[in-house]
Amino acid sequence: MQFFLIFFDIAVKRAIFVVMEEDLKTAVEVMRKGGVILYPTDTIWGIGCDATNAEAVDKVYKIKKRASNKAMLVLVGKMEDVENYVETVPEMAYQLNELSEKPITIIYDNALNLAQELLGDNSSVGIRVSREVFTQRLCRMLRKPIVSTSANIAGEPSPAFFDEISDEIKSAVDYIVKYRQDDKTPHAPSSVVMLSADNTIKILRP
């Protein structure tokens, strides 16, 4: 009986892995073609695309009906990736990312190699190193940062779970990730800090 349960558990995990791999491949393929996806992150479900593709980013703004002067954050798979998209990564950023007990979004000045629409004042950009395995792999397979913005029309409540996302949003994206659609685990929003090149920190959200 115990052997059967172990075998069954392995089979289930393998099935989940296969489904996840197909999900990842499809999502990456869609983004490489300039498409927009709906996907789970380490906080809430988000709308995403290749953050270096200006046309794809523009699609996200249109789907959300979001003002073009409002910046959006991006996700990367590991801290070292930040160096490709920011002129100077302050030493403090590595410490904050390592020591923070919850997901942390760091706003840096002088962004590089990203769609201009994503940037705020001083060419600033919010970047978070994802702590969620699916999103980490998504970033690594795409080899680009991914836009992450809540899956709602601007001004409406941000959905905490997949089944709270409106049909309007679901029908507007090019691909909906299957992974974690039934997950009801609550996820806290990320901390948000602004970090200057001289390591000065301003906490925007604890």
Task: Locate the predicted segments by residue.
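Intrinsic disorder/low-complexity segments
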Residues: L5-I6
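Active-site-adjacent structural elements in enzyme catalytic cores
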Residues: D9, K13-P206
